């Protein structure tokens, strides 16, 4: 098993175990004020960069969260979410044909958000910071040696993205006590291509991800 893959799986397992432990303890001591949520949904990932042409694509989300009373009409939401983020890049094949090459990024997010409750158990606005831990991006099979349009880079050259990204996020949650829908937007303020500039200093690569999420939350 590759070393990076092993450590990614080990980190994922550790994060899950930590969150489940915290949620279980909190649920035991504060049954009247805290609720565990199971989250599933979809995302649209956009890679914002001036270096070359990209297109957004859809991926999936799954995770756990805990919503608890914080102060008056404020709640606090702790969450961990696992995702697959997808996007495509304009390239030229070895036969000089233009092709869109797809990329997949496995990731895990840890977030801590304040929630302003507009209607108790039905409507709230969330905002706060989150950290995303990225695996190595996977380029579409057979397209690794395509040349990214407008550059001298190959498709495989931009796989080693930053392992950590910081996102401010804002969202809206609506529904019933035990079933809600959440829509949120996250914008990465760190350069996702920061790692690549040491290998390709003349390209001055810079990219900021934006993620639109649509999730269903089932509260236990």
Give the ranges of each region predicted by the language model.
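Bacterial Sec-dependent N-terminal signal peptides
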Residues: 1-39, 212, 216-220
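Residues on the lipid-exposed face of transmembrane beta-strands in outer-membrane beta-barrel proteins
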Residues: 38-42, 62-68, 80-82, 110-116, ...
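Flexible, solvent-exposed loop segments that connect beta-strands
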Residues: 47-54, 84-106, 135-161, 192-206
